[in-house]
């Protein structure tokens, strides 16, 4: 006999003669089969829905750009041309090819196919058609650069002249050293021993372009006071007694006024400050010595600048001195009513190739003027700058040897006229 549990899961033995009857299947395997079929159908449904959503949210051009997109063969049926954009920066134009028909439109099976318009970047302007390119403007001819334009040829003579100038400057600087105010004052004291009419005015502190006129007027006022027997109103020199100074003023006929000039300061106080700074450093810098000769006997103002126009142009300086000469006519009139005249001595740059010989040149010109005030010695200067400074070096050596016996920074004793 069979148990009740086995009756559900197992079948009764089939007689051999009845083999044509169907074999019965239990209910539990049948349920499992139905579950598998349902799961498969659900998976297929999800795949179909997913593909449908993809088709809804992606255009044809996006689908065709995927790597799994199938490549279809072109059909013979005429289809509208679809322009597929290419990423920037150079999108090509969609031009139908006569030999190859365009690809068909891929659409969903549930909805009828619809033509897709051409897609192009909104910010990209349409390019011109290849068949009608715009005319190009004519190009300007490029200048032809030769080797001379890139590397200009420098003649060998230029290098030779540069070397000669450098050698000449070194020779000149070795011949004529820079003269300071002490050497210039000693030179004036030496000139006084040769020409009694010259007054050796102190050069410490020297006159400047801002106060030389006041200094000349003050000396002439003191000279008038001495001639009248009156006391001196101006300040006395530092290294000269009052009696000796009065004797110098009484017999003087020529005032050599040395001016110290620097192009940077614009006032008298700034000039004195610059002078002090250069003296501490022991450097001449851009300073320059100028000379104004006041010839009382000849009633003449003579201006000498070895650099010719270092302060201002000779024309402007002459106009300024002519105005000052009219003022001197009122301050120190002549007995015969003769007026002061003005002369600009230098007609060119005298100290060529040297930047520190201005003081020596001023003393050299003063010495020439004392020997003969009516002869222009500058006309006889050598043309060659080295030869010119060799002559100046001879004068400098003679002066330096002569002033060695003079007292240190003291005025020489003037002789009384009566």
Swiss-Prot record:
A GO cellular component annotation in the UniProt record: host cell
Positions of the catalytic residues: 288, 305, 358
Coiled-coil regions, chain positions: none
Regions of compositional bias (Pro residues) in chain numbering: 86-141
Compositionally biased intervals (Polar residues): 1-10
Keywords (A to Z) from UniProt: Hydrolase, Membrane, Protease, Secreted, Thiol protease, Transmembrane, Transmembrane helix, Ubl conjugation pathway, Virulence
Pfam families: Peptidase_C48
EC nos: 3.4.22.-
Record-linked InterPro entries: Papain-like_cys_pep_sf, Peptidase_C48_C
Main location: secreted
Record region (Disordered): 1-23, 72-144
Gene3D superfamilies: Adenoviral Proteinase, Chain A (3.40.395.10)
TM region positions: 40-60
Similarity-based family: Belongs to the peptidase C48 family.
Role according to the record: Effector proteins function to alter host cell physiology and promote bacterial survival in host tissues. This protease possesses deubiquitinating and deneddylating activities.
Identification of the protein by name: Deubiquitinase and deneddylase Dub1
Organism field: Chlamydia trachomatis serovar B (strain TZ1A828/OT)
Top-level taxonomy: Bacteria, Pseudomonadati, Chlamydiota, Chlamydiia, Chlamydiales
Gene that specifies this protein: cdu1
């Amino acid at each position: 006999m069979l148990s009740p549990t086995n009756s559900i899961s197992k079948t009764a033995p089939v007689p051999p003669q009845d083999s044509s009857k169907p074999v019965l299947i239990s209910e539990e395997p049948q349920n499992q089969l139905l579950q598998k079929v349902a799961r498969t159908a659900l998976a297929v449904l999800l795949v179909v829905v997913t593909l449908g959503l993809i088709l809804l949210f992606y255009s044809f051009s996006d689908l065709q750009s995927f790597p799994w997109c199938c490549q279809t063969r072109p059909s013979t049926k005429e289809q509208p041309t679809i322009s597929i954009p290419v990423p920037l920066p150079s999108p090509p134009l969609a031009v139908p090819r006569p030999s190859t028909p365009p690809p068909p439109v891929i659409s969903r099976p549930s909805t009828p196919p619809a033509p897709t318009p051409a897609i192009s970047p909104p910010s990209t302007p349409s390019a011109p058609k290849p068949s009608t390119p715009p005319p190009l403007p004519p190009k300007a001819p490029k200048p032809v650069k030769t080797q001379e334009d890139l590397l200009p040829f420098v003649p060998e003579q230029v290098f030779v002249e540069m070397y000669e100038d450098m050698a000449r400057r070194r020779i000149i600087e070795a011949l004529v050293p820079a003269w300071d105010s002490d050497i210039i004052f000693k030179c004036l004291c030496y000139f006084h021993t040769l020409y009694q009419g010259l007054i050796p005015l102190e050069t410490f502190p020297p006159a400047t372009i801002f106060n030389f006129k006041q200094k000349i007027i003050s000396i002439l006022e003191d000279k008038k006071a001495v001639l009248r027997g009156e006391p001196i109103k101006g300040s006395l020199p530092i290294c000269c007694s009052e009696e000796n100074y009065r004797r110098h003023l009484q017999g003087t006929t020529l005032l050599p006024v040395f001016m110290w000039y620097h192009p940077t300061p614009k006032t008298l106080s700034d000039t004195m400050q610059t002078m002090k700074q250069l003296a501490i450093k022991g450097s001449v810098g851009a300073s320059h010595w100028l000379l104004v000769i006041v010839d009382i006997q000849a009633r003449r103002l003579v201006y000498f600048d070895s650099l010719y126009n270092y302060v201002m142009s000779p024309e402007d300086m002459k106009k300024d001195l002519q105005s000052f000469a009219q003022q001197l006519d009122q301050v120190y009139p002549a007995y015969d009513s003769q007026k002061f005249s003005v002369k600009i001595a230098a007609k060119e740059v005298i100290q060529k190739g040297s930047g520190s010989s201005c003081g020596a040149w001023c003393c050299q010109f003063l010495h020439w003027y004392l020997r003969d005030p009516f002869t222009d010695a500058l006309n006889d200067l050598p043309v060659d700058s080295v030869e010119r400074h060799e002559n100046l070096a001879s004068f400098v050596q003679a002066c330096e040897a002569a002033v060695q016996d003079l007292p240190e920074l003291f005025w020489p004793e003037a002789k009384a006229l009566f």
